[in-house]
Amino acid sequence: GGSFQEGNHGAGTGCTVGKIRGPQFAMKGGIGACAYRQGDLMVGAIVACNAMGDVLEKGRIIAGSRNDEDTGFADSEEWLIANGRRQKDIFSGKFVGENTVIGCVITNAALNKAQANKLAAVAQNGIARAVRPANATFDGDAVFAMCRGTVPADPDAVGSMAARAVEEAIVRSVK
């Protein structure tokens, strides 16, 4: 087998973040992965981050839309709140469909179909923690879940681990 590279490699090639003010203000996005273990329970995530918004770590923007002076970040969420209509104009043309954070959560937890669907929905919280704005009209943000079904586990604990893994995978995708 080969080694896994995070950042602008593989499915992360060509990914950018912070496109909300236009592609000229964007930075490189990428692909990231993270896994957690609690006893025999394992929960991991792999995420390709091609977000319209900014990526945050511990509440601080680490990648996203550059400001006009190229000295820092413009804060995409604040910009959207102040300029929502203009944002729609930017994405009315060729950039529609070019924004998504998409990932997969993989676990060995024994979950049924309904619990696995809920796991995917709860894992989506990791996107909301790490990307702002997230799940906007021009995003295709989504998380899927796969469960091996070998370790009995509390579905809520698995969901919390999954959201953390998605959040950290997004952070790693831009570092």
Question: Predicted regions span which residues?
Answer:
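A structural signal for small-residue-enriched, beta-sheet-centric alpha/beta enzyme cores
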Residues: 1-175
